[in-house]
Amino acid sequence: MRALIQRVSEASVTVEGELLGEIGPGLLILVCAMQGDGEDQASALAARIAKLRIFKDEAGKMNRSVRDTGGAALVVSQFTLAADTSRGNRPGFSAAAPPADGERLYRHFAAEIAACGIPTATGRFGADMKVRLLNDGPVTIWMES
């Protein structure tokens, strides 16, 4: 699985004007299941992200996790993280998991983040979503399982 993690002051996701999820301080996690991924990869990535120390401590150093700060997570599916741009001008997405697997793993990943004690909001798999965020830092991290 691939994830792009952004430390945010706030974030929200809407579909056709309907607010699906919003958070205050925490993490916006854009996630993509790849060919061959399973629940083990989703669980491992969620556990790593839950422990990722990218929030400032009292000394101003990035030494606290989203759990440590009481922050939340907004988890949004984004198959375009599987883009292959090595040839031509049009990205290919064949490395992404098939839609049924992608949706199952996206839901599993979000549930695993929540199981880590992090309040979790989500988007809608496969929908044309509008994501708003106020990046804090900015801090943006790329992770793969």
UniProtKB/Swiss-Prot annotation:
For this protein, what is any one GO molecular function term? tRNA binding
- Give EC number(s), comma-separated: 3.1.1.96
Which Gene Ontology CC terms are recorded? cytoplasm
The record's keywords, sorted A to Z, are: Cytoplasm, Hydrolase, RNA-binding, tRNA-binding
Membrane-spanning ranges: none
Q: Does the keyword tRNA-binding apply?
A: yes
What reaction does this catalyse? glycyl-tRNA(Ala) + H2O = tRNA(Ala) + glycine + H(+); a D-aminoacyl-tRNA + H2O = a tRNA + a D-alpha-amino acid + H(+)
GO BP annotations listed? D-amino acid catabolic process
**One of the Pfam families matching this protein, by short name:** Tyr_Deacylase
Q: Which SUPFAM superfamilies match?
A: DTD-like
Question: Cross-referenced InterPro entries, in alphabetical order?
Answer: Daa-tRNA_deacyls_DTD, DTD-like_sf
Where in or outside the cell it occurs: the entry states: Cytoplasm
- Residue window of motif Gly-cisPro motif, important for rejection of L-amino acids: 137-138
Mind telling me which NCBIfam families this protein's record contains?
Answer: D-aminoacyl-tRNA deacylase (TIGR00256)
Q: What does this protein do?
A: An aminoacyl-tRNA editing enzyme that deacylates mischarged D-aminoacyl-tRNAs. Also deacylates mischarged glycyl-tRNA(Ala), protecting cells against glycine mischarging by AlaRS. Acts via tRNA-based rather than protein-based catalysis; rejects L-amino acids rather than detecting D-amino acids in the active site. By recycling D-aminoacyl-tRNA to D-amino acids and free tRNA molecules, this enzyme counteracts the toxicity associated with the formation of D-aminoacyl-tRNA entities in vivo and helps enforce protein L-homochirality.
Q: Which HAMAP family match?
A: Deacylase_Dtd (MF_00518)
Protein name (Swiss-Prot/TrEMBL): D-aminoacyl-tRNA deacylase
Q: Which gene encodes it?
A: dtd
